From Swiss-Prot:
EC number(s) given by UniProt: 6.3.4.23
InterPro entries on file: ATP-grasp, ATP_grasp_subdomain_1, IMP_biosynth_PurP, IMP_biosynth_PurP_C, IMP_biosynth_PurP_N, PreATP-grasp_dom_sf
Protein name: 5-formaminoimidazole-4-carboxamide-1-(beta)-D-ribofuranosyl 5'-monophosphate synthetase
EC category: ligase
């Protein structure tokens, strides 16, 4: 639990002009459709941008206001916070916001109203907390290896924080683990601190889906808004090379996310999809109140037994939602109109303003 208290945030909200709310975010990650969705719902928008990185938000015309900073981490500076509060801002957090601002700063220093549950962000950042929440929900996860010396089969090695897969690798022995750790350190992709916190789990063979949910605290309902799969470099390039050439090229696979494409899942798997979302939401309410408020994502593999195995979660808007900026097959069925995740967030904020329930959705 951070130093920023909900009651202090609600004191700030109490002074806001509710008829002139601004939806704000950091200029990265999913900012385009967060801001576009806000404009679709009738809000003013603001983006906090590094100088020189404002081009997409200018060219696509999604931001009414620009707050320029030297570095993205400066969003927690007092002058930036003052500007945000002065424009009645509600900030929508995303992966880059947490990574650049720093989780402790978001918890302890960022005194601006945020959509969702700021306390839950640590539960996605720390692997043990993430695993606790998912397993206590009764959701299948890959087996965890407590130390690299225990590796006796194919495993995936991951590192903490929102890093888009950078530094992740597959290995099948302790010796191979050591060799690949050294290689990743030489590429400056990981540090000694990362190695200490390495998360080692069984490699599950299957098809990849990232399932994007929205939990409406106003309706107490879990929605499935869309799904995507990832383009990862350089693994997606390597698999295009014939096997013999792969061996001769001696390339080391990496799993850095470079893009996303929309997918739909086999319809008979949707009961599992909804059940996993419902279970996680109920567990989150118990572990970190008020729970999984707003968008969240479960990254999974579907094995040949048609079992959904969850290997990672995002407790805020996930980058894969960029794959359905104009709505997905699922959001269209749900709403009958174009509904991106960004617009869904602003729809919830608008409904909360109209029903005087901003305290239910902000922290």
């Amino acid at each position: 639990m951070g130093k920023v208290k909900k009651e202090d945030i609600m004191d700030i909200v109490e002074k806001y002009d509710k008829s002139n709310i601004t939806i704000a975010t950091l200029g990265s990650h999913t900012a385009l459709h967060i801001l576009r969705g806000a404009k679709q719902e009738g809000f003013r928008t603001a983006v906090v941008c590094e100088k020189g990185k404002e081009v997409p938000y200018e060219r696509f015309g999604v931001a009414d206001e620009f707050i320029f900073v030297d570095e993205y981490k400066d969003i927690v500076n007092s002058d930036v916070q003052d500007k945000l509060r002065a424009m009645n801002a509600i900030v929508v957090p995303h992966g880059s916001f947490v990574a650049y601002a720093g989780l402790s700063n978001v918890e302890d220093k960022f005194n601006v109203p945020m959509f969702g549950n700021r306390d839950i962000l640590r539960w996605e950042a720390e692997r043990d907390k993430e695993r606790k929440m998912i397993t206590q929900s009764g959701i299948r996860m890959p087996r965890k290896f407590d130390k690299p010396e225990d590796i006796n089969k194919e495993v995936m090695v991951k590192f903490p924080g929102a890093r888009g897969g950078q530094g992740y690798f597959i290995c099948s022995s302790y010796e191979e683990f050591q060799n690949k750790i050294q290689e990743m350190k030489e590429r400056n992709w990981i540090t000694d601190s990362d190695v200490k916190d390495a998360h080692i789990e069984e490699y599950v063979c299957g098809t990849n889906f990232c399932i994007h949910y929205f939990y409406s605290a106003l309706k107490d309902e879990v929605e499935v808004l869309g799904m995507d799969s990832r383009y990862e470099t350089n693994i997606d390039g390597i698999v295009r090379i014939p096997a013999q050439d792969q061996i001769e090229a001696n390339l080391s696979p990496s799993y850095v996310v470079s893009g996303n494409h929309p997918v739909v899942i086999r319809e008979s798997l949707l009961p599992q999809v909804f059940e996993n979302g419902d279970r996680l939401v109920e567990t989150a309410k118990k572990l970190v109140k008020p729970g999984m408020n707003g968008p969240f994502c479960l990254q999974c593999l579907v094995n040949d037994d048609r079992e959904i195995v969850i290997f990672e979660m995002s407790a805020r808007i996930d980058g894969g939602t960029n794959s359905f900026m104009n709505g997905s097959a699922y959001s269209y069925i749900q709403f009958g109109e174009v509904m991106s995740m960004g617009r869904r967030i602003s729809r919830e904020i608008k409904n909360a303003i109209e029903t005087d329930k901003l305290d239910v959705i902000l922290t």
